[in-house]
């Protein structure tokens, strides 16, 4: 049941983050979500957490979207498989950030492979996943206000220490997600023969 977790506009949060990441990679021009500094403290916190995540896990995560060999026909299935694998051990804020980074990476890979229409679809899938599968956890964990307190500007040192624990298992989950994606690709290849 999705209610309080989506009190801040989930679609605006996703659009801002994806736009921000696409602009970092030089893919999007002109005004739109993700351009310039975020006025909303939640958007600022998600951008900062995403940047930190990418810095910490660059080697593990860098080519995940490319390794999935996404096509317009397989994109939603791959998105769901990786997202489900990511949260298999239960949600936490670190995994939620990884979900945002993965979604943005999938959007960037779509643009890179000239499949721009997938960008809007991936954002829709992200919003739906957040609002149907993660909303209750977000709400029970203090909502987006708690996320902003943990990851936003001026966060207490204690919050940073707690956050370190959330990042610890993300590398293992991402490695598993890459392996799952590779197995699905190999399985699909052999099934088509």
From Swiss-Prot:
Q: Which UniProt keywords apply?
A: Acetylation, Apoptosis, Membrane, Mitochondrion
- N-terminal signal peptide: none
Q: Which SMART domains match?
A: BCL (SM00337), BH4 (SM00265)
SUPFAM superfamilies in the record: Bcl-2 inhibitors of programmed cell death
Motif range (BH4): 9-29
Tissue expression profile of the protein: Expressed in almost all myeloid cell lines and in a wide range of tissues, with highest levels in brain, colon, and salivary gland.
**Which of the residues bear the PTM N-acetylalanine?**
2
- Give compartment(s): Mitochondrion membrane
Q: Which GO terms describe its cellular component?
A: Bcl-2 family protein complex; cytosol; mitochondrial membrane
For the motif BH1, give the residue ranges.
85-104
Record CDD domains: Bcl-2_like (cd06845)
Relate the induction remark in this record: By Igf1.
* One Gene Ontology molecular-function label: identical protein binding
What's the superkingdom here?
Answer: Eukaryota
- Keyword Mitochondrion attached: yes
The annotated phenotype of a deletion mutant is: Mice are sterile due to arrest in spermatogenesis associated with a gradual loss of germ and Sertoli cells from the testis.
> Topology in the membrane?
Peripheral membrane protein
Do the record's keywords include Membrane? yes
Motif segment (BH2)? 136-151
Instruction: Relate the protein's function as given in its record.
Output: Promotes cell survival. Blocks dexamethasone-induced apoptosis. Mediates survival of postmitotic Sertoli cells by suppressing death-promoting activity of BAX.
Q: What is known of its domains?
A: The BH4 motif seems to be involved in the anti-apoptotic function.
The record's annotation in PANTHER family points to:
BCL-2 RELATED (PTHR11256), BCL-2-LIKE PROTEIN 2 (PTHR11256:SF13)
Q: What is this protein called?
A: Bcl-2-like protein 2
């Amino acid at each position: 049941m999705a209610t309080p977790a989506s009190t801040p506009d989930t679609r605006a949060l996703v659009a801002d983050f994806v736009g921000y990441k696409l602009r970092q990679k030089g893919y999007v021009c002109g005004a739109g979500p993700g351009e310039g500094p975020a006025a909303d403290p939640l958007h600022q916190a998600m951008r900062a957490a995403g940047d930190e995540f990418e810095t910490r896990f660059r080697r593990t995560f860098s080519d995940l979207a490319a390794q999935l060999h996404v096509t317009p026909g397989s994109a939603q299935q791959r998105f769901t498989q990786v997202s489900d694998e990511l949260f298999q051990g239960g949600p936490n804020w670190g995994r939620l950030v990884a979900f945002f980074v993965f979604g943005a990476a999938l959007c960037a890979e779509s643009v890179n492979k000239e499949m721009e229409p997938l960008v809007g679809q991936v954002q829709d899938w992200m919003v739906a996943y957040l609002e149907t599968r993660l909303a209750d956890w977000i709400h029970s964990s203090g909502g987006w206000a708690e996320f902003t307190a943990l990851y936003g500007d001026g966060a207490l040192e204690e919050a940073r220490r707690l956050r370190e624990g959330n990042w610890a298992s993300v590398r293992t989950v991402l490695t598993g997600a890459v392996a799952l994606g590779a197995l699905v690709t190999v399985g699909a290849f052999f099934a088509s023969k």
